[in-house]
């Protein structure tokens, strides 16, 4: 079983991401071909989810660069990690857990789809919906809908405080 973090884990993730890059496919394209969500594909390739044996053939077909040893490592239970400084109220704890656990993959997909930037938490919509699952049990749906904000190049001639000082 793979230990928590460390050089070995980072090396495996680098190899998995290299196989993805070789495929020249986005997380979404791989997901469509493999019958998985794009976030789950990213989770698998970042070693934050365990590849199930029945899913391996479809993923290998979508990402031909996945070697036997990489697939074997992906089938081991991963060391899932996120920032440990969390709030202890159960609902907030679980929401933080979900955001922290999937955050790195979501960030990579945002960068892949939009470029270098972030989702606004100001021009932002969030909804919590109750739906009934296929098994008849209640399900919680949390939707984050935020405006994309690209990072700015920090040009001195665009910095108003400097422009104001020069004209004074």
Swiss-Prot record:
<dbReference type="InterPro" id="IPR008076">
    <property type="entry name" value="Cyanase"/>
</dbReference>
<dbReference type="InterPro" id="IPR010982">
    <property type="entry name" value="Lambda_DNA-bd_dom_sf"/>
</dbReference>
<keyword id="KW-0456">Lyase</keyword>
<dbReference type="Pfam" id="PF02560">
    <property type="entry name" value="Cyanate_lyase"/>
</dbReference>
<dbReference type="GO" id="GO:0009651">
    <property type="term" value="P:response to salt stress"/>
</dbReference>
<dbReference type="GO" id="GO:0008824">
    <property type="term" value="F:cyanate hydratase activity"/>
</dbReference>
<protein>
    <recommendedName>
        <fullName>Cyanate hydratase</fullName>
        <ecNumber>4.2.1.104</ecNumber>
    </recommendedName>
</protein>
<comment type="function">
    <text>Catalyzes the reaction of cyanate with bicarbonate to produce ammonia and carbon dioxide.</text>
</comment>
<dbReference type="InterPro" id="IPR003712">
    <property type="entry name" value="Cyanate_lyase_C"/>
</dbReference>
<feature type="active site">
    <location>
        <position position="120"/>
    </location>
</feature>
<feature type="active site">
    <location>
        <position position="97"/>
    </location>
</feature>
<feature type="active site">
    <location>
        <position position="94"/>
    </location>
</feature>
<comment type="similarity">
    <text>Belongs to the cyanase family.</text>
</comment>
<dbReference type="GO" id="GO:0042802">
    <property type="term" value="F:identical protein binding"/>
</dbReference>
<dbReference type="GO" id="GO:0003677">
    <property type="term" value="F:DNA binding"/>
</dbReference>
<dbReference type="GO" id="GO:0009440">
    <property type="term" value="P:cyanate catabolic process"/>
</dbReference>
<dbReference type="InterPro" id="IPR036581">
    <property type="entry name" value="Cyanate_lyase_C_sf"/>
</dbReference>
């Amino acid at each position: 079983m793979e230990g928590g973090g460390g050089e070995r884990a980072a090396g495996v993730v680098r190899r998995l991401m290299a196989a993805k890059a070789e495929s020249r496919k986005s997380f979404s394209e791989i997901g469509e071909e493999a019958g998985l969500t794009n976030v789950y594909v990213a989770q698998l390739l970042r070693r934050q989810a365990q590849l199930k044996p029945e899913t391996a053939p479809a993923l290998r077909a979508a990402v031909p660069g996945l070697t036997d040893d990489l697939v074997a490592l992906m089938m081991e239970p991963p060391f899932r990690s996120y920032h440990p400084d969390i709030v202890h109220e159960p609902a907030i704890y679980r929401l933080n857990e979900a955001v922290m656990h999937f955050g790195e993959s979501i960030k990579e997909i945002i960068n892949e789809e939009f470029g270098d930037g972030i989702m606004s938490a100001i021009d932002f919509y969030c909804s919590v919906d109750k739906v009934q699952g296929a098994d008849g049990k209640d399900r919680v749906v949390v939707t984050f809908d935020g405006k994309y904000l690209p990072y700015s190049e920090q040009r001195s001639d665009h910095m108003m405080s400097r422009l104001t000082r020069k004209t004074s």
